[in-house]
Amino acid sequence: MTNSRNKGVSYERELSKLFEAELGVERPQRRLEQTREVDMGDLVLGDDLFMIEAKRYAASSGGWFRPEWWAQAKSAAAKHNMIPVLVYRYDRLPNRFVFPIFVIQPDYCVDDQFGWPTEGNAMSPVVVDQEVAMMVFREWLVI
């Protein structure tokens, strides 16, 4: 368990540095409460806009993410009124980013004036590579 926890912590730090370098934002800090509370997410990016859930695993099931990872990311983001993002990587494969479709197609974005969509078609997952993910973040963060 300790090795997997260390692997997760290391991956969160790696992503934090990536966001700082690629997006020019202050390095997102790890959410230490995540070890004591459920639905906390791993990193927060963009003044409480994106809640990042990071997953780093050795074995790949075709390079695709596990549905329970996406469910975890959505649940944590909904609890804090943020946009969920799942970032995952299997050994010897590149990072993949999973966004809800409303981040890519704003027509799905309108839920109500006080929050982001949390269910339905607006939450359909869209998987992109790192280069596209950074473009998406830049659009939303208005850097």
Regions found by a protein language model. Give the residues of each.
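Catalytic phosphate/metal-binding cores of nucleic-acid and nucleotide-processing enzymes, i.e., regions
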Residues: M1-I143
